[in-house]
UniProtKB/Swiss-Prot annotation:
Described purpose of this protein according to its UniProt entry: Participates actively in the response to hyperosmotic and heat shock by preventing the aggregation of stress-denatured proteins, in association with DnaK and GrpE. It is the nucleotide exchange factor for DnaK and may function as a thermosensor. Unfolded proteins bind initially to DnaJ; upon interaction with the DnaJ-bound protein, DnaK hydrolyzes its bound ATP, resulting in the formation of a stable complex. GrpE releases ADP from DnaK; ATP binding to DnaK triggers the release of the substrate protein, thus completing the reaction cycle.
Name of the molecule in the record: Protein GrpE
UniProt feature, compositional bias: Polar residues: 1-11
Main location group: cytoplasm
Organism name: Beijerinckia indica subsp. indica (strain ATCC 9039 / DSM 1715 / NCIMB 8712)
Recorded GO CC terms: cytoplasm
Disulfide-bonded cysteines: none
Localization in the cell: Cytoplasm
Sequence similarity: Belongs to the GrpE family.
Amino acid sequence: MTDSTNNQGTSGRPDDDHTTEEVASVFNDPGAQAPAGEPDPFVVLENLQLENAGLKDKVLRTYADMENLRRRSEKEVADAKLYGVTSFARDMLTFADNLHRAIESLPAEAKQAVDGPLKTFVEGIELTERDFLSRLAKYGVKKIEPLGNKFDPNLHEALFEIPDESVVSGTVKQVVEDGYVIGERVLRPAKVGVSRGGPKA
């Protein structure tokens, strides 16, 4: 009686075998239901993957926004450095104009004829103009050189037309007042006279 009882106990207990089969079936069959009260591991995994994808997308978007902000900030700083002197430079153009008028008021023949202190004075004015324009260029301010070029309404202001059939119509023939740019912006357009009557461009 004792042997039979022991044999029955060691041969296997129905409850234990049933539990092992249930656990195995859950892991071997993806469609199998998880034990009552516990979340399905495949559903949990799928939810985690979706959450991970969402977080990754947010990180990428945040990184892109930060890169755009960095580029925009760098451009604003560069523009501030370049264009921060715009008002001051525009005021200084009057000084440049006066220097140029002083030099132009003396005809070329008279310049060659002068001697002594007067010659030194004229050369001093010319040197001052060159030095002043050089200093403006250091801050991005450059003179527009329109003479002989095609009229550009973005850079030039036409005051009058000059009949001339020897050049292409619309060519800048005379500069009344120098124009200047700062960086890529027009500080002041050049006031010019434009040819007409010649061949079309």
